[in-house]
Amino acid sequence: MSSYRPYQHIERRKSRQIHVGKVAVGGDAPISVQTMTNTLTSDAQATIEQIRRAELAGVDIVRVSCPDEASTAALEEIVREVNVPIVADIHFHYKRAIEAAKAGAACLRINPGNIGSAERVREVVNAARDYGCSIRIGVNAGSLEKHLLEKYGEPNPEALVESALEHAKILEDHDFHEFKISVKASDVFMAVAAYQQLADCCDHPLHIGITEAGSKRAGTVKSSIGLGNLLWAGVGDTMRVSLSAAPEEEVLVGWDILKSLGLRHRGVKIISCPSCARQGFNVVETVQTLEDRLQHIKTPLTLSIIGCVVNGPGEALMTDIGVTGGGNGRHMVYAAGRQDHTMPAGDMIEHIVELVEKKVSDIEAGKVEASTAKQMDPAAS
């Protein structure tokens, strides 16, 4: 079997590289996964605890809102107590950006539509330079500048891109180049078109996302369509899935999108059938239980859980460990695509967990290689 499948290749857009704290964004760096806290930032302990849950889910960068002086006052403690770079989200009050930079924020997110005059932007740029922060120019369809709304009549991709490039020029005119850009909209068509246009006319790293995407289910679908299209086209250097849900849920969905496209790998990827009358065991309950039992594993590994022999053996060919439902209460286990042994239904969960943990131990010790790594296009890592 070929170790590289050309139909899985994604040619990523070439962008310049910046840093958000210790995390590289753009260039050949992995596409980073972001989220945003929804606690009161002034409640440092609650915010720290929420960030730590996001860290366990695999977050790379976390954004916190800084609407008032109490929030920026708490930022120093938050930055000190967590293990990921913090982006300070600034709207309306440019002084909050300066305070956040002093407090140790790794990046300042500013919205050109409401941060104020060019002079205020200049002060923010100087603070970012003085304290080693990068900047995110965060353009949003819901808060475009008045002159662009008058020019275009309504928010559209062209207005989003024009706003972004205007403010990129301001930063460049101040000889500041450590910035990334986002052009978000809640409308998938508008957001995707804006990002595609922006990607074609500049080499700045892009933070991609569909803003205000909705609830956990609806927002996951909406973000998967929008971000999936962009990532498949090679557009995007860092991403956030915006959900009306806990931040760690955003992180998990973000990772699942990247894993689905082979752009990054982390933890156990379970491939499972929807189940039908042919199933030899309860696939739905088994998968739900395994997702919970295996969430502590960070090493990339694939596991197929298929209820019958129609597709089970074929799926097992492409996974590290495969399970196919059989008759008489016994099910076939595959290892590295080959039939290995059968197991009784009663011991199924514990047996699979044991097999996965043993495989992970062997991978980490360098004794074997995961099929995920074999199938992966090196250019997409």
UniProtKB/Swiss-Prot annotation:
Its cofactor is [4Fe-4S] cluster. The keyword Zinc does not apply. [4Fe-4S] cluster binds at C273, C276, C308, E315. GO terms for biological process: isopentenyl diphosphate biosynthetic process, methylerythritol 4-phosphate pathway; terpenoid biosynthetic process. Keywords: 4Fe-4S, Iron, Iron-sulfur, Isoprene biosynthesis, Metal-binding, Oxidoreductase. Pathway: Isoprenoid biosynthesis; isopentenyl diphosphate biosynthesis via DXP pathway; isopentenyl diphosphate from 1-deoxy-D-xylulose 5-phosphate: step 5/6. GO terms for molecular function: 4 iron, 4 sulfur cluster binding; 4-hydroxy-3-methylbut-2-en-1-yl diphosphate synthase activity (ferredoxin); 4-hydroxy-3-methylbut-2-enyl-diphosphate synthase activity (flavodoxin); iron ion binding. Its EC number is 1.17.7.3. It comes from the Bacteria. The keyword Cell cycle does not apply. Belongs to the IspG family. Converts 2C-methyl-D-erythritol 2,4-cyclodiphosphate (ME-2,4cPP) into 1-hydroxy-2-methyl-2-(E)-butenyl 4-diphosphate. This is 4-hydroxy-3-methylbut-2-en-1-yl diphosphate synthase (flavodoxin). It comes from Gluconobacter oxydans (strain 621H) (Gluconobacter suboxydans). The gene is ispG.
